[in-house]
Design a protein with these regions (language model features):
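Short, basic, glycine/proline-bearing loop/turn elements
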Residues: 113-132
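Asparagine-centered strand-capping/turn motif at beta-strand->loop junctions
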Residues: 246-248
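Active-site-proximal helices and loops of the catalytic beta/alpha 8
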Residues: 2-110, 126-127, 135-136, 144-153, ...
Length: 248
């Protein structure tokens, strides 16, 4: 970052902060090496968002890095096409040699998928994504792809139950960017709602599949990923040895 500023540390080019920086890479490698000496096998996870050439080098050195797919998955869950291709959530699509990409659909910085499903979801005849039951089914749909793409994942709190309060939800029920960091309702009662519980179990089944002895190698080692995420009809096949999964 300092390399984009003038000699006084001012007039910085914020847009240049993500450009590949070899000095930054060296610093991170030093941190990683020290951690592995002190705690062998420890995970190092970066909220980095640098140029892909830098992230490739860090990923191949053992780091895991966040990958923001909020817009892509939300476009898919709402049933709209402009940004619904989530191919960049596949580590091989970025040229990475290891599945160290931690993709996420939601985070502390991103809008809740269910909020936008219910507010802006597509409608076709009787099929209405703005209705709770259908919106939750759309979350099962995107979850099927999200959890079966190899690599670690991040799930934001209550996403597994279809939490629909906006990131900008205010205590009085209104929506404002001024309320972004305000406390949000804690809805443990969602587990007793059948459609929300169905989503919970659908996501749990996908996660359990990742730990199944028959399929675990698909998510933890070099594998062949063929897919087409560009159109309305999406599919993916992951193969490792004799094991394979197909998601449609």
């Amino acid at each position: 970052q300092v390399n984009t500023c003038d000699p006084n540390g001012e007039n910085c080019n914020v847009g240049g902060w993500s450009a590949k920086d070899d000095s930054r890479i060296t610093i991170w490698k030093g941190y990683y090496d020290t951690l592995q000496i002190k705690s062998p096998g420890s995970y190092v996870i970066l909220e980095h968002f640098a140029d892909n050439s830098e992230e490739i080098e860090l990923a191949n050195y053992g780091r895991m890095l966040w990958g923001n797919l909020n817009n892509n998955y939300n476009e898919a869950s709402m049933g709209f096409s402009p940004g619904w291709n989530f191919d960049y959530g596949v580590y091989t699509a970025r040229g990475w040699g290891s599945p160290h990409l931690i993709t996420y659909m939601e985070s502390h910085d991103e809008e809740r998928l269910m909020y936008k499903n219910l507010q802006f979801g597509n409608v076709s005849g009787a099929y209405n994504i703005k209705t709770l039951a259908t919106a939750l089914k759309r979350m099962e749909l995107v979850g099927a792809f999200f959890f079966t793409i190899p690599g670690p994942k991040m799930v934001w709190q209550f996403g597994e139950l279809g939490y629909e309060y906006s990131i900008n939800y205010c205590p009085n029920g209104s929506i404002s960017v001024n309320c972004r960091t305000d406390s949000k309702p804690i809805r443990w009662d969602y587990k007793s709602v059948t459609d929300r519980d169905n989503l919970y179990h659908a996501w749990a089944a996908m996660i359990n599949l990742r730990h199944s002895p028959q399929f675990s190698a698909l998510f933890n080692s070099a594998n062949n990923i063929t897919r087409d995420f560009s159109g309305a009809f999406k599919w993916m096949k992951v193969t490792q040895g004799a094991a394979n999964i197909m998601v449609i």
